[in-house]
A protein has these predicted regions:
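Domain-level signal for soluble alpha/beta catalytic cores
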Residues: 1-184
Length: 184
C-alpha cells in the first residue's frame, strides 16, 4: 500500500542528490517484481505491468534504469519491454546462483542468443559470489558490451523453502540468517 509513496520518496531523494552533484548519473532501481533469486513464473502481462508501474514513478527523476538481480532471460526481456516507452537507457543485472547458470538454468554463454543488449548501458552479474565472478568474467568479456559484477557476502543464493515462505508471509528476517554469511 506504500508502493507509490516509497518509490516517489526514493526518486525525490535521488533528484536532490543529482542537484547537489550534477556530474552523477542517477539510477532507478528495478529489482525482481516477485521473489528474488528465483524464476518469476507469473504471466508476461503481470510482470511487464509490475515493472512499468515502478518505472513510470521513477522515470522523471532518474537518468537510467538498473534492472537488477533478474533470474531469467525472460524476466530481463520483459523488464526491457516494460520500460521501452519511457526512453531511458538501462543496465541489465542478471543473477547467477552457482556456476554459470541463472536460477532459470540458462547459461551465461547463451546471453547473446537470448537477449539484445545493444541498446543497454551494459550487463552486470548481480549479487553473486566471488567464485561466480571468477567463473563468468571471461564469458562476459566476449559479449562486446560493457560489463561488471556486484558481489555479495552470502554463502549461497539458492533459496530454501524457508526463504520463500518468510517473504510470502510478509515476514522480515535478516537475509544472513537464511542465506548464510560468508566468513572470508
Amino acid at each position: 500500500e506504500k508502493f507509490e509513496e516509497l518509490n516517489l520518496k526514493a526518486a525525490e531523494l535521488a533528484a536532490k542528490a543529482r542537484d547537489k552533484f550534477p556530474q552523477v548519473m542517477i539510477a532507478g532501481g528495478l529489482p525482481p517484481q516477485n521473489l528474488v533469486y528465483e524464476v518469476d513464473n507469473r504471466s508476461d502481462d503481470e510482470i511487464i505491468s509490475d515493472f512499468y508501474d515502478q518505472a513510470k514513478i521513477l522515470s522523471p527523476y532518474v537518468d537510467f534504469f538498473n534492472l537488477e538481480v533478474l533470474s531469467s532471460f525472460r524476466e530481463a526481456n520483459l523488464a526491457i519491454k516494460a520500460i521501452e516507452e519511457l526512453k531511458k537507457p538501462y543496465l541489465v543485472g542478471l543473477h547467477v546462483s552457482s556456476g554459470n547458470e541463472l536460477p532459470s538454468q540458462e547459461k551465461i554463454s547463451e546471453i547473446k542468443s537470448n537477449m539484445v543488449l545493444n541498446n543497454s548501458l551494459g550487463l552486470m552479474l548481480s549479487c553473486i559470489s566471488p567464485e561466480n565472478y571468477q567463473l563468468n568474467s571471461h564469458e562476459l568479456s566476449k559479449l562486446g558490451c560493457p560489463y561488471g559484477f556486484k558481489l555479495n557476502g552470502f554463502e549461497f543464493t539458492t533459496p530454501k523453502l524457508s526463504y520463500n515462505k518468510t517473504y510470502s508471509n510478509g515476514d522480515s528476517v535478516n537475509p544472513n540468517l537464511i542465506l548464510g554469511k560468508r566468513e572470508d
